[in-house]
C-alpha cells in the first residue's frame, strides 16, 4: 500500500497537519459576503468543529473563525491533502468495489487544478459550483468510499457524508442532495447565509454530483445557438463574422470554440488571467491579448481572411 492509499484510508488525521498556506499558482474564490450575525457565526464554527476531536477545538476554533472572517466561508485549508489532485486509474484507489473507486476518480477529477475553477475552495465551475463545503468532508467521503462494499449506499447532504447504509448491489452507491432550500420561502441571501453556516451548498449541475466534463458538455449546444443567431440576424454566411462575448470559465469557455466551429472570428473578454490561460492550454481559445487594440487588430485580420480565429482579451 502506498502513501496515497494510506492517506485515503486515514480520512481525517488524529493530529493537526501542517497548514499548507495559500498557493498563488491556482485561482482562488473571491471573498463571500459577510451575512452572519454573532450567533450565526458561533453556530458556523460549531458546525465546522464537529468533524474533529475535542482536543483540537481550541487550536482550530480561532483558525476557522479567521477563515470565516477573511473568506466568508470555512474551507479548512489545513486539511487540504498533500498528494496531487487528479483522476487516477481505478486500481490506484483503495476500494472494495469498482463503483466506489469510480466515484473517487470522479471526485478527484472535479478537484483537479487543471479542471476546477477554484480547486482549493472545492469549486469546480460557475463561481459557486461546490464539490464539498470543506476539506474535512472530502477526507471523510473518500474514506467512506474506500470502505464501501457493493451492498452499501453512502448518503451525502450538501457535501456532508451521513454515513454508509445497507442497500443492495442494484441500488445507487451514492445518493447526493445539494442546495436544499424552499423556493417560496427563501431568497438568494438565505442560500448565502446557510452556505456560510455550513449547512448547505450549491453544487451546480455536475460539481456536487461529481461528473463534470468541462466546456465539452455545452459546446454542441453553444455552437447551434450561435449558428441560429447568426443566420437569423445576418445574411446567413458565417465566414468572417465577428462574435464578441465575455467569459472563459468552465462553461462559458465553450464560446470561442463554438464560434470557430461555426466559422466565425471571436473575441472573448475575461478578467481572470488564470482562467484564460487554462482555456488556451486546453485548446478552447487560440490567442490571448492583454491590449484591446491588438485583440481587435488580430480579429480584423482573421475576418479579412474569412478565418475563424478565437481571441481572448484579458484587461
Residue ranges and their predicted role:
Residues 1-213, 314:
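Long, compositionally biased, glycine/small-hydrophobic-enriched stretches that function as flexible linkers
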Residues 151-156, 236-238, 306-313:
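Flexible, glycine/charged-enriched surface loops at secondary-structure junctions
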Residues 204-227, 231, 239-242, 248-305:
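Catalytic or ion-translocation cores adjacent to nucleophile or general acid/base/metal-coordination motifs
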Residues 270, 314-315:
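Conserved residues at beta->alpha junctions
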Amino acid at each position: 500500500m502506498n502513501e496515497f492509499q494510506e492517506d485515503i484510508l486515514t480520512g481525517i488525521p488524529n493530529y493537526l497537519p501542517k497548514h499548507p498556506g495559500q498557493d498563488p499558482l491556482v485561482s482562488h474564490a473571491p471573498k463571500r459576503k459577510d451575512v452572519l450575525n454573532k450567533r450565526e457565526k458561533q453556530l458556523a464554527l460549531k458546525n465546522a468543529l464537529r468533524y474533529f476531536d475535542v482536543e483540537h477545538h481550541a487550536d482550530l476554533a480561532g483558525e476557522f473563525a479567521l477563515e470565516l472572517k477573511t473568506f466568508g466561508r470555512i474551507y479548512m485549508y489545513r486539511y487540504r491533502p498533500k498528494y496531487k489532485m487528479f483522476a487516477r486509474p481505478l486500481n490506484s484507489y483503495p476500494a472494495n468495489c469498482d463503483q466506489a473507486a469510480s466515484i473517487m476518480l470522479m471526485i478527484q477529477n472535479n478537484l483537479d487544478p487543471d479542471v476546477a475553477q477554484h480547486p482549493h475552495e472545492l469549486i469546480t465551475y460557475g463561481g459557486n459550483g461546490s464539490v464539498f463545503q470543506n476539506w474535512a468532508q472530502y477526507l471523510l467521503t473518500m474514506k467512506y468510499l474506500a470502505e464501501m462494499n457493493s451492498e452499501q449506499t453512502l448518503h451525502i447532504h450538501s457535501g456532508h457524508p451521513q454515513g454508509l447504509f445497507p442497500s443492495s448491489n442494484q441500488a445507487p452507491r451514492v445518493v447526493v442532495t445539494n442546495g436544499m432550500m424552499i423556493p417560496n420561502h427563501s431568497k438568494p441571501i438565505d442560500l448565502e447565509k446557510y452556505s456560510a453556516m455550513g449547512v448547505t451548498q450549491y453544487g451546480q449541475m455536475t460539481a456536487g454530483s461529481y461528473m463534470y466534463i468541462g466546456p465539452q458538455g455545452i459546446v454542441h449546444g453553444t455552437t447551434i445557438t450561435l449558428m441560429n443567431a447568426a443566420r437569423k440576424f445576418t445574411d446567413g454566411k458565417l465566414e468572417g463574422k465577428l462574435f464578441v462575448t465575455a467569459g472563459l470559465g468552465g462553461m462559458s469557455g465553450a464560446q470561442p470554440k463554438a464560434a470557430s466551429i461555426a466559422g466565425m472570428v471571436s473575441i472573448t473578454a475575461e478578467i481572470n488571467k488564470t482562467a484564460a490561460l487554462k482555456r488556451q492550454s486546453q485548446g478552447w481559445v487560440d490567442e490571448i491579448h492583454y491590449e484591446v487594440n491588438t485583440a481587435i487588430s488580430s480579429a480584423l485580420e482573421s475576418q479579412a481572411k474569412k478565418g475563424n480565429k478565437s481571441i481572448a482579451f484579458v484587461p
